[in-house]
């Protein structure tokens, strides 16, 4: 029936509804709603969490709460805690024994002092993976290729890129 938003001050309910793409009268589908809130759908899909995280709101949280369930209709209240924008603090590169760090940093879109952006972070990972000097699978692997270290107490975040250099050719 209705989707309402509480706790949102950065984006209007209208903007959030445009990103959510669920309208009054649509079939209620929890899986689709969660993909449009948190991601996990197609790579090209834009989702509510990304909207916030692209503008520094790394500490953003959202909880959909089902209210007024009547027959086949349900109202959903989206409870948001926006938090404060996070600024990039340290950008660390590990594993580059042969490649000069400056060569890697030229590929990055994450800079100390800038607001954190999920899209810039993901683009930096793709750029490192496509350089040719590093194992792209290891670079793209969230378990070992990179880490985001948020510090909510001072609204900063450190980003660590762990590169795995390919063996150099020998004659």
Describe each model-derived feature in a short phrase.
Residues 1-171:
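Periplasmic polypeptide-binding modules associated with outer-membrane biogenesis and secretion
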């Amino acid at each position: 029936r209705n989707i309402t938003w509480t706790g949102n001050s950065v984006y209007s309910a209208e903007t959030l509804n445009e990103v959510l793409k669920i309208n009054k009268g649509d079939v209620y589908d929890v899986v689709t709603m969660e993909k449009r809130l948190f991601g996990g759908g197609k790579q090209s899909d834009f989702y509510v969490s990304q909207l916030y995280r692209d503008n520094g709101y790394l500490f953003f949280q959202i909880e959909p709460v089902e209210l007024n369930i009547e027959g086949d209709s349900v109202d959903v209240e989206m409870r948001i805690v926006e938090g404060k924008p996070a600024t990039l603090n340290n950008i660390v590169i590990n594993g580059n024994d042969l490649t000069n760090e400056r060569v890697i940093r030229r590929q990055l879109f994450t800079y100390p002092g800038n607001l954190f952006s999920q899209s810039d972070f993901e683009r930096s990972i793709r750029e490192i993976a496509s350089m040719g000097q590093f194992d792209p699978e290891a670079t793209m692997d969230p378990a070992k290729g990179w880490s985001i270290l948020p510090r909510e107490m001072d609204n900063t975040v450190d980003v660590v890129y762990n590169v795995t250099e390919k063996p150099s050719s020998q004659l």
